[in-house]
């Protein structure tokens, strides 16, 4: 069982990253709310891991804190919610927003998340409302809005490739290609990095 990785951050291709630990490169999928907080490529990173073993694959889901990982594990306990959908849910809104939406039974907000229909949103509320009491959601994540995006410049070099990267990331989170392209084009501005485009696209849906 892999619980934590500490090593050199080699690649950042949202929502995936590659981290080298003792000469071995690990591919890790990470919610965008966590991805925004990663250090620059070439520096040391510490990532808490949720390890999934399937017949056809071994998957690593990464988080910056144990609390983020704990919330993810609570989300995927809900009926019909697997790791992929859990990743999309915690990419579409911050932990605080998600906890507040569940506590307030805000179905209309939850259904805006990729892959979350009305029935899934209702299940999340029914099954998670009691479990999330006392979580203190305010400190689960470092607010993404305060993160400097300067370090993201090593991800993407040209505006068009940044937009392509953002669209690909949104598709991998569950949005349809046409919808992903529309989301990015509506928020795109000159010199925006892929991470900025993804963040603003996701914010526009909530």
UniProtKB/Swiss-Prot annotation:
Return the annotated region ranges for Flexible linker: 144-157
Pfam families registered for this protein in UniProt:
HHH_5, RuvA_C, RuvA_N
Q: Where in the cell is it found?
A: Cytoplasm
Region (Domain III) residue ranges read 158-206
What's an example GO BP annotation here?
Answer: DNA recombination
Single GO cellular component annotation? Holliday junction helicase complex
InterPro entries attached here? DNA_helicase_Holl-junc_RuvA_I (IPR013849), Hlx-hairpin-Hlx_DNA-bd_motif (IPR003583), NA-bd_OB-fold (IPR012340), RuvA (IPR000085), RuvA_2-like (IPR010994), RuvA_C (IPR011114), RuvA_C_sf (IPR036267)
Q: Which UniProt keywords apply?
A: Cytoplasm, DNA damage, DNA recombination, DNA repair, DNA-binding
Q: Where is this region: Domain II?
A: 65-143
Using the chain's own numbering, where are the disulfide bonds? Answer: none
Where is this protein chiefly located? cytoplasm
Presence of keyword Cytoplasm: yes
Q: Which Gene3D superfamilies match?
A: 5' to 3' exonuclease, C-terminal subdomain (1.10.150.20), DNA helicase RuvA subunit, C-terminal domain (1.10.8.10), Nucleic acid-binding proteins (2.40.50.140)
- Keyword DNA-binding present in the record's keywords: the answer is yes
Using the UniProt annotation, give all residue ranges assigned to the region (Domain I): 1-64
- Could you give a GO molecular-function term held by this entry? four-way junction DNA binding
Domain note for this entry? Has three domains with a flexible linker between the domains II and III and assumes an 'L' shape. Domain III is highly mobile and contacts RuvB.
Q: What is known about its subunit structure? A: Homotetramer. Forms an RuvA(8)-RuvB(12)-Holliday junction (HJ) complex. HJ DNA is sandwiched between 2 RuvA tetramers; dsDNA enters through RuvA and exits via RuvB. An RuvB hexamer assembles on each DNA strand where it exits the tetramer. Each RuvB hexamer is contacted by two RuvA subunits (via domain III) on 2 adjacent RuvB subunits; this complex drives branch migration. In the full resolvosome a probable DNA-RuvA(4)-RuvB(12)-RuvC(2) complex forms which resolves the HJ.
Similarity field: Belongs to the RuvA family.
Give a short account of what the protein does.
Answer: The RuvA-RuvB-RuvC complex processes Holliday junction (HJ) DNA during genetic recombination and DNA repair, while the RuvA-RuvB complex plays an important role in the rescue of blocked DNA replication forks via replication fork reversal (RFR). RuvA specifically binds to HJ cruciform DNA, conferring on it an open structure. The RuvB hexamer acts as an ATP-dependent pump, pulling dsDNA into and through the RuvAB complex. HJ branch migration allows RuvC to scan DNA until it finds its consensus sequence, where it cleaves and resolves the cruciform DNA.
User: HAMAP family from the xrefs?
Assistant: DNA_HJ_migration_RuvA (MF_00031)
- Quote the protein name from its UniProt record: Holliday junction branch migration complex subunit RuvA
- The gene designation is ruvA
């Amino acid at each position: 069982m892999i619980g934590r990785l500490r090593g050199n951050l080699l690649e950042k291709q949202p929502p995936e990253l590659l981290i080298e630990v003792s000469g071995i490169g690990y591919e890790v999928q990470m919610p965008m709310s966590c991805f925004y907080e990663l250090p620059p490529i070439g520096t040391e990173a510490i990532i808490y891991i949720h390890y999934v073993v399937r017949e056809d694959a071994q998957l690593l889901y990464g988080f910056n804190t144990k609390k983020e990982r704990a919330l993810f594990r609570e989300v995927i306990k809900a009926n019909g919610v697997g790791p992929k959908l859990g990743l999309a849910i915690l990419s579409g809104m911050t932990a605080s927003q998600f906890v507040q939406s569940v506590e307030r039974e805000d179905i209309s907000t939850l259904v805006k998340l990729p892959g979350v229909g009305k029935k899934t949103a209702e299940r999340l509320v029914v099954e998670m409302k009691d479990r999330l009491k006392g979580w203190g959601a305010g400190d689960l994540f470092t607010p993404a809005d305060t993160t400097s995006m300067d370090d993201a410049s090593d991800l993407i070099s040209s505006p068009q490739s940044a937009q392509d990267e953002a669209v690909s990331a949104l598709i991998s989170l569950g949005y349809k290609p046409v919808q992903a392209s529309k989301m990015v084009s509506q928020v795109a501005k000159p010199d925006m990095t892929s991470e900025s485009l993804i963040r603003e696209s996701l914010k526009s849906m909530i």
